[in-house]
């Protein structure tokens, strides 16, 4: 971009859900609690205030995905960080306080309970069946072709057998990839097309 112009910006969240000062617990008689420690960033994916992701070119979506991967990998270099969540808010109904199109990345020092349970169940499945549960589900869905919405060389998009919410779609890599930070540029280019 030309001087002063930008297409994607990343900055610390002005009102972070977590902080990075490694605060200790705060005790209150019977209860013990801990402050949410971590990193909270905003990824603004367009300079245009009225644009939304469906207005973006595939190339621009790929650049957004690569920016998120870059921030993910940078956050995971911190030995205190155990879990990174990436999400996109769209409008006030989703809790967005910033109307401009953006994503949020929250990196925390503990694995959230729900994610820990998912990881434990995946590990149990792998011990019993010799493969990752996500890979097994993706293979099953690709074989049955009942819930497949879209498919590319490296990805499959499908509705879960038991959705937790309306319009839920899972997008999974066809081959086992440990985490988002391991996706290649080519894979993210392909994912952007979906």
Residue spans for each PLM region:
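HIT superfamily nucleotide-processing domains
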Residues: 1-194
